[in-house]
Amino acid sequence: MKQIPEDIKKEIEKLVKELNYHNYRYYVLDSPVISDEEYDMMLRRLKELEEKWGYILPDSPTQRVGAAPSEKFEKAEHREPMLSLDNAFSIEELRDFDARVKRLLGSSEEVEYTVEPKYDGLAVELSYKDGLLYKASTRGDGYVGEDITQNIKTIKAIPLRIEGVDKIPEEIDIRGEVYLNIDEFERINKERIEKGEPVFANPRNAASGSVRQLDPSITASRRLYMSCYGIGYVKGIEFKSQIEFIEWLKKGRFPVPAYVKLAKGIEEVIEAIKEIEKLRQGYPFETDGAVVKVNSFELQRKLGTKTREPRWAIAYKYPAHQGITKLKDILASVGRTGVITPVAVLEPVKIGGVTVSRSTLHNWDEVERKDIRVGDYVIVERAGEVIPHIIGVVKDRRTGEEKEVKIPEHCPVCGSKTVREPGEVAVKCINFNCPAQVEERIKHFASRRAMNIEGLGDKTVELLHNKGIIKHFVDLYKLRQEDIKGLPGFAELSSKKLIEAIAKSKKTTLSRLLYALGISQVGEYASKLLAQHFRKLEDLYHIKAEKLVQIPQIGEKTAKTIEQFFNNEENLKAIEELKRMGLKVENPEFEEEKKPSPLKGLTFVITGTLPKPREEVKEMIEKAGGKVSSSVSKNTDYLLVGEDPGSKLAKAQALRVKTLSYEEFLKMLE
């Protein structure tokens, strides 16, 4: 490594500290104090310094993404078991729990409890040593889980280093739940529908599927959150209670539950549970209950555990909000990529205080699998109080007049013949000029994550399109105030504001524009990848798929759709027209050609004890473009051998795999 000037070293350390603080403000507190542009400039400066000087701190935000895909997850043993919770389904069962706790403690005094929302996600353990995150693992069977460290590092709400507390423990295992907010869950499912992929049944499955990806870049493309609420193994610090531990987590910049109440006695617990039930309607995440814990850690130890559950905690489950209603019709809805989705039209029914009259059915296979017919009485559930879905049919109420639903052979809007690719669930209209697709493409182009045209909502797009004022997203930039003034909802001021918002959107970034163009298979993450690898939009004109697949995380299918889009003259003509109307595109995400990767394409296996921790050596290999596998095979390029090697050495010799000493390995990195 080069000799680093002290001022450069200090600048890198300052940037890391400041960027981590701003991540905390943005992802944990949801209260940023700098703009996205300022953050991006700081991050870019940090990347430049790290690449030039090779000085990379383990908690640098640049280390959150970049690990190579794994063949499988390694096993990870929990030093303290990660137990599941017993459930209470009624207030009486809660009172029984309280009586049991008092009996086991041999006391009639009121017990102090904590009450918090029950997050519906994937239970995860974060392991820190001397304040640094070195391992993250799933619950698994409670004793052994899977090592998901690289994936967890992509979640920006999770600190890579513990800061802000008076005392940092030598070692600590922090437990919590990784989850998805409802809007991100819906975005992922919408994207999967457009790609013809099966949808996730609920946010919990989506969160679990996102975390348990062998390729960390897929995890990084989804906005995951974590709520930290539990403690496992700890050394070098002592906590007396759950409340004290939660306060320590807050100071340490960890995301904690949205609500934590200290309750004296079971009656206060019941009041807190009722309060959470009211509050959960406004939560951005799904919660199906509340968790009650004995506050004192000393009393927790006295109460102990059963085989699988602690005696000092219980999860109260809110009653499921369901209703039975008649299915009036199943409509075929056409999306911007031509995917035709079934939508259930229901007799209005009140579920959990909300009137439900529609429900998505995701895809036509689901309609067939559940044998859903028009005229059926169906069971509708509001999962997590937000997303209504049909969970089944009341078949004993059938009269024989119900109508089976057929997969549409023609587009319900333009009449074109539909297509279904082999192996895909999506049924598509392939007429690019289908009015429904055009309208949805304009909505997408104007949306918040794309061109972000304020005030141009779905209803306004529908109005302008139906009146023939706009026929393509390019037409948005041709709009004049007189075109919209006088239309329903548009007076002098509102029409002026919309024209100003459209003009403001002309200045954008390349990644936003790429996403706005609505290229099939290209979501926000793929748009950012393209922006990192291409300086300007014109560099993508007439691009070939062979060049695109050289970008890590861009697969053949995505590369092909990008090639098709940028080799279509009509699309290029539309982009050029946008530019003529004043579109200004910046690209702060473009990364200059990086230094060569000396280990690119090579697979390593490690055995024995090395001068540096194995995780650190693994990161060195991955940063240099290599890949680390857990077992020796004919596909292994090198076995890195430390002191006291195990059986892997004999296997490598038998397979004639090259062996390397640590010194030889370092020379390869030069």
Swiss-Prot record:
What are the entry keywords?
DNA damage, DNA repair, DNA replication, Ligase, Magnesium, Manganese, Metal-binding, NAD, Zinc
- Residues in domain BRCT? 594-670
For this UniProt entry, the molecular function terms from Gene Ontology, in alphabetical order, are: DNA binding; DNA ligase (NAD+) activity; metal ion binding
SUPFAM superfamilies from the UniProt entry: BRCT domain, DNA ligase/mRNA capping enzyme, catalytic domain, Nucleic acid-binding proteins, RuvA domain 2-like
Q: Which GO terms describe its biological process?
A: DNA repair; DNA replication
Q: Name one GO cellular component term.
A: cytosol
Q: Which positions in this protein are listed as binding Zn(2+)?
A: 411, 414, 429, 434
Enzymatic reactions:
NAD(+) + (deoxyribonucleotide)n-3'-hydroxyl + 5'-phospho-(deoxyribonucleotide)m = (deoxyribonucleotide)n+m + AMP + beta-nicotinamide D-nucleotide
Please list the residues that make up the active site. Answer: 118 (n6-amp-lysine intermediate)
Task: Write down the InterPro entries for this protein, in alphabetical order.
Answer: BRCT_dom, BRCT_dom_sf, DisA/LigA_HHH, DNA_ligase, DNA_ligase_CS, DNAligase_adenylation, DNAligase_N, Hlx-hairpin-Hlx_DNA-bd_motif
Q: By its UniProt entry, which HAMAP family does this protein fall under?
A: DNA_ligase_A (MF_01588)
Task: Give the family from UniProt.
Answer: Belongs to the NAD-dependent DNA ligase family. LigA subfamily.
Official protein name in the record: DNA ligase
